[in-house]
């Protein structure tokens, strides 16, 4: 802000805090951010059933906070802390186009089922059909599985492996891929029975392993695929982790305790990525027979960031003066 012909950075931050809702009332702003996320999606994207993935992103928080702060969630140690601001997103990949469709703030007391329901409700509001849903091990519990059994689309979840020899670890056996059913009891959720697909693949140096590797997936709903096909389908989920890495490249940093301000920065960053993909596929593409040729090398993310900065400078004016303060 100091380089622009406009208000100072501290003035902007103060005014922004005055406009944003208090941390306890983020629902309205969350809805506005979700509308902004999908404001420039291709029309054809919203008319077809899409493969979707949901996941959590943990952003480390190193500041002081109240013990009962709902915006701070505990997690595995990362970047020197076990305290995080946590967000959940729902994401799709269609013809190599990656778009974030929904975003929600995850509070400390919330279960993963709560946030999954919120994300799916957002997508239903867009009238987007889900062809297939991919979830990681963080969503593997009986409450989520029971809820997904009531949904009209199939879901693939990475199975959590527990036990030394028994439990789900006993399913990782044999040298051939296979399908079985598994009944899991829980002390807090109802007992659930579900299909498990075990895919066997030779690592050949991948996954930092050698020899035979086994991958187990829970399949909820009707899905007539071989376990190896399930394995390859599930690899689509890793696009969502790519979106988190890119989001962190364009996300504004802050030391503020305000969870609303931090949610705003995450929402703006994801919107910038959605716009980047939209511009590449609509403006940086060469028509040809069949699928269009998108010239990704002409608009890398670094250049997109610089373009946005140039637009801000053109609109706000760039300050070329250096003011030397007088001696006291």
Each language-model region and where it sits:
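Short, solvent-exposed helix-loop connector elements
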Residues: 225-234, 246-266, 283-286
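Active-site-proximal, Lys/Arg-enriched surface segment
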Residues: 10, 14-95
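Short, motif-level signal for alpha-helix interfacial/capping segments enriched in acidic residues
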Residues: 26-40, 113-118, 217-223
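Short, conserved catalytic/metal-binding motifs centered on acidic residues
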Residues: 1-2, 11-12, 48-62, 90, ...
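An anionic, glycine-rich sequence signature occurring as long contiguous blocks
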Residues: 151-248, 305
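Domain-level cores of phosphate- or acyl-group-handling catalytic modules
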Residues: 109-167
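Electropositive, glycine- and tryptophan-enriched low-complexity nucleic-acid-binding patches
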Residues: 72-129, 212-215
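A short, flexible helix-boundary coil/loop motif
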Residues: 3, 172-204, 211, 249, ...
